[in-house]
Amino acid sequence: ADGEYYETMNSVVGKLMEPGSTFKTASIMVAMEDGHINKNTRVDTGDGKWPMYGRIMKDHNWNKGGYGMLNVTRVLMKSSNIGVSRLIDGAYHDCPDKFVRGLNNLGVGLPMDLDIPGSGRPRVYMPKKAKNGHWILPITRNGVPMELGKPDLAWMSIGYALQLPPIYTLAFYNGIANNGRM
């Protein structure tokens, strides 16, 4: 009203967002580091729609017939949701904690030491196995620990079901450009 602009939040460091497709590279790197896949590993992406535990995962070209068989290199080139999620779910479905640990090893899920007011902390939760054998997260809803649902790992692998401030994505890709130094 007074013609002045006031920045109330530094969105780059403070706003939590689902990184979406920009996260696929991190997921693939974790699986490669753990020896589950290599650049020539092939995965069937079908006709662009794939059932994942009661939900349908789609690639952006699902209405044009999808991509069919792709190797890991092409999965990243095409930004295939199905390819990444099937590779990660296949490797880590029974051990999602190893996937999150791999993300942490890349520096993606760990808090950065930013001396900037309002800096956000990533929400990449480490699952642990409960006594009933289900995977639970270290967060609660109405006092009850939340379970890691069967489709959650697949969606996490393509940048959903987790949140990062945008600076984390920037730092990750800068690390790649700088030979691993973030």
For every predicted segment, state its role.
Residues 1-21, 26-182:
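Beta-lactam-recognizing serine transpeptidase/beta-lactamase-like catalytic domain environment
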